[in-house]
Regions:
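Intrinsically disordered, low-complexity segments enriched in serine/proline and basic residues
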Residues: 10, 14-15, 37, 41
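ADP-ribose/NAD+-binding catalytic cleft of ART/PARP-like enzymes
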Residues: 24-75, 103, 263, 268
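Short hydrophobic targeting helices and cationic amphipathic motifs
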Residues: 13-16, 22-28
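Extended catalytic/binding region for NAD+/ADP-ribose chemistry, centered on the ART fold
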Residues: 71-96
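Short, flexible loop/turn elements at secondary-structure junctions
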Residues: 59, 86, 109-111
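Conserved NAD+-utilizing ADP-ribose enzyme module
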Residues: 38, 96-100, 109-274
Length: 274
């Protein structure tokens, strides 16, 4: 199987990329999976040598992103939220059932301070601690309240020194998975598995004022709500169905729940979190 990584705006031409044979055997159930795999391999090969192409889904064309123009209650607080997948951007653009646009940008991160939450030095609880800080509508039971406090005291990363954050996107269904872990109803292993459902991939969030000068608008492509609103709804529905099936599976006695994390005073660096 061969995928082509498209030419960048500055003319840097990646070569044809052969996908390893092991990926051929994976059941690719989502329409944008191949695009996501190709992007991941391309980024690994280029190692940041080339500027990135990112997309922002919105109801209108955004030629000049506005610093702190988003909601503070987004996953990582104020920021300009983008993805490397034009298909996902179109879904986000039509999330209210109306037509929108996938705005295309060139982004150069080489001189920026980037926090990649999916890199080996971090774990899913670092991501979750940030989510508990910025997202609202968490359960109010005692375990959930204690869990939020524990996560923020032991796993919260100071994002102020960073210009850009790369990490999971907590769409509605994915946020509910995170809520279940914080409430103590699913294990850490099941949360990690759930975050891979639906192939949402990563989002790239421009946080600092300096980072906004590293984004250049290229163009915008219309997103038809009759197509992409349904795709987003289907993705969410299938992820929830898959999650419910996974949730019914018997937990191993060795699996970690949030209450175990608190009782055993587990912190960053514990091998059980990897």
């Amino acid at each position: 199987m061969v995928l082509f990584c498209p030419k960048t705006r500055r003319g840097n031409q990646p070569h044809l990329t052969s996908i390893p044979h092991r990926i051929d055997s994976i059941s690719l159930q989502r329409y944008n999976t191949l695009n996501y795999i190709a992007t991941a391999i391309y980024r690994k090969q280029t190692k940041g040598e080339y500027p990135m192409i990112v997309y922002h889904g919105s109801s209108h064309i955004v030629q000049k992103p506005v610093y702190n123009g988003s909601k503070r209650s987004n996953d990582y607080g104020y920021g300009f939220y983008t993805t490397e997948s034009i298909e996902l951007a179109k879904e986000w653009a039509c999330s209210d059932g109306q037509n929108g646009f996938a705005n295309k940008y060139e982004a150069d991160l080489r001189s920026l301070n980037v926090l990649n939450l999916n890199s080996p030095e971090y774990n899913i609880l670092n991501w979750l601690a940030l989510l508990t800080r910025y997202r609202s509508y968490w359960q109010k039971n005692s375990i959930a309240e204690d869990a939020k406090t524990y996560l923020q005291e032991n796993f919260l990363i100071d994002v102020d020194p960073f210009d850009v954050i790369i990490g999971y996107r907590a769409d509605d269904s994915y946020f509910s998975f995170a809520q279940d872990f914080v409430a103590g109803t699913i294990s850490l292993a099941k949360l990690s598995e759930a975050m891979r459902l639906g192939k949402l991939g990563e989002q790239i969030v421009f946080k600092s004022k300096r980072s906004f000068s590293h984004i250049s608008f290229i163009d915008a492509e219309p997103a038809d709500a009759s197509i992409y609103y349904e795709r987003k709804a289907t993705r969410d529905r299938e992820a929830r169905q898959e999650y419910r099936r996974s949730k019914k599976a018997t937990d191993s006695i060795n699996e970690l729940f949030i209450i175990d994390t608190m009782r055993e005073n587990i912190k960053n660096g514990d091998p059980r979190l990897q």
